[in-house]
Amino acid sequence: MYDILIKDAIIIDGGNNAKYQADIGIHNGKINKISKNIDAKNGKRVIFAKDMYLTPGFIDLNSHSDTFLTLFTIPNQDSLLRQGITTILGGNCGSSLAPLVSEDGLKAIQKWTDPGQINLNWLTFQEFLDSLKKIKIGINFASLVGHSTLRRGLIKDEFRELKPKELKIMANMLKTAMKQGAFGLSTGLAYSHAKMATTKEIVELAKIVKGFNGLYTTHIRGEAEELIPAIEETVDIVKKTGVNTEILHLKAMGENHWPNMKKAIEIIEKNKTNINFDIYPYTVTGSVLYILLPDWVAEGGKTQLLKRLKDPSIKEKVIREMQEKKSYEYDKIIVATSPINRAFIGKKITEIAKAQEISVEEAIINLLLISEGRISIFLDTLSEENVKAGLAHKLSFIASDSAGYNIKYYQKKSDLVHPRCFGAFPRFLNKYVEKEHLLGWEEAIYKITYGPAQKIGLKNRGLIKKGYRADLVLINPNEIADKGTFENPYQFPRGIKYVIVNGKLAVDNEQITGEKAGQILKRA
């Protein structure tokens, strides 16, 4: 007797193979049988799936549910399940929740959320995983080690290169975490506290990851005028170490830099290194407000940043540099979160400046001072053509760069989250696959299932194959669509009919069940 029997589904198996029709029997959390004409009497629960696509559960290799802390505050991760995500990889962009050398390691997540909202009662990576097991979560979770978490925990807010002894300590901490189940290392080299990390420092740590056959993911040093040097640095790291590498959310920000996207991909292709990259299906990105400032302003951390901006002479210098450089199109930047003054949420930076009768640059500085540096923004700065080229490229995977939420979160707060938190994968499948035929369904599903599973190093997930874990998604291809907007992102998508996590129904006919069947995954 099967726990769940799915009848007459069109199977897209995740391996970029041709579709076929079959029944699937699920028992004890695994795919037990794939065959035609399994008697419906053999299923405790039978789902009739005629004309629907059955795929492996989607694997999001660029998630921030851990460092945004929603994995704890919203453990069912409704918005991810409703878009078909069954497994996420956390610890990205240089920030993870373990291992912690000191409480300073957690400062790396302050730009996104308040660490004080949960009780962090761990230090080691193993203790972190053990704590997660106690709360029960709706999706499978794997994690990298954040480079900035290690670095900041060790030298706090000091803006300098590491001493040899400090690098050795970091290396030993990384080794221990890898032994305890971490899947690899991530860097956030664009953020202020990692800017002083040398290529040599990253190379030494990447060698350790390579020794464990782990994964190195990187938010590269720059995505505008710095894009090409940042790509070249990544290629250099891979050539020196051979480490399996993923460039997170590859993009060229700002119209002046759009041609660099093609150049960046050509550099990756030409060098034939073990590098992939991920793309999200939007031209609007999200970040923190302070990235609009010259790099030197953020040196030494938030305290130093605010201290500098309060100094009238330094403030004047910052404004002058911003006006001379003109790196961003300010009329395309919207305030997404503003914890202290919520009246700014949803407004363009230019609107705020106009209302106050000051320059946009001064408005940005004032916003940072009022909010104590904790404002996030949306930037409409990407090229649609570049997004398409990235999505269709043979080296790309699709990732959300998001966190999991639910509708109740919006009822408590007025913050705007990026709509990718609710609809990245349905948008990709609807807009770029079903409607625009940018790529076929088989290749598209590979890019969000077995491809990421192989890249991360997940075992027995990402394929519809006998003996594999029963993480599955049933899709109505005629209905699939995202609904969230930047004005109202808190809307679940259409067309993801059923989601099964480890053999349990997490979404039943587009309704969240609250089953919480997710598992904490460790590197084998």
What are these regions (language model features)?
Residues 176-233:
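Divalent metal-binding pocket/active-site signature
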Residues 311, 389-396, 400-401, 472-519:
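C-terminal cap of metal-dependent C-N hydrolases
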Residues 53-77:
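Di-metal (Zn2+ and/or Mg2+/Mn2+) metal-binding site signature of metallo-dependent hydrolases
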Residues 132, 138-140, 144-164, 170-191, ...:
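Active-site neighborhoods of metal-dependent hydrolases
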Residues 71-183, 271-273:
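Divalent-metal coordination cores built from histidine and acidic residues
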Residues 9, 29, 51, 62, ...:
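Divalent metal-coordination and catalytic microenvironments
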Residues 1-5, 10-57, 74, 482:
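Histidine-rich, glycine-flanked metal-binding segment
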Residues 11-23, 375-382, 386-387, 436-445, ...:
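Acidic, glycine-enriched loop/beta-strand segments at the rims
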